[in-house]
Amino acid sequence: MSRLAPPLRLLQAPLKCWAVPKAHVSAKPARTPTSPMEQAVGLSVMFVSFLVPSGWVLSHLESYKKSSTT
């Protein structure tokens, strides 16, 4: 074990003085608050962007199965 002690100390040294940078987080409110209409549009765009492609794949699943077997 005495042979492994110096290499282990070399590997552990950088971990002891590891400094995590401080995040620059602002606690101020937004300059221009988003209206409920903007929030609704943003949410609907997010849902549509995820659901339309998956719906397309699910609706064409049978044709995908047929094309993969031939």
Swiss-Prot record:
Transit peptide: 1-24
GO biological-process terms attached to the record: mitochondrial electron transport, cytochrome c to oxygen
Protein name: Cytochrome c oxidase subunit 8B, mitochondrial
Organism of provenance: Carlito syrichta
Mitochondrial matrix side: 25-35
Family as reported in the entry's similarity comment: Belongs to the cytochrome c oxidase VIII family.
Function recorded in the entry: Component of the cytochrome c oxidase, the last enzyme in the mitochondrial electron transport chain which drives oxidative phosphorylation. The respiratory chain contains 3 multisubunit complexes succinate dehydrogenase (complex II, CII), ubiquinol-cytochrome c oxidoreductase (cytochrome b-c1 complex, complex III, CIII) and cytochrome c oxidase (complex IV, CIV), that cooperate to transfer electrons derived from NADH and succinate to molecular oxygen, creating an electrochemical gradient over the inner membrane that drives transmembrane transport and the ATP synthase.
Gene Ontology terms: cellular component: mitochondrial inner membrane; respiratory chain complex IV
Subcellular localization(s) per the UniProt record: Mitochondrion inner membrane
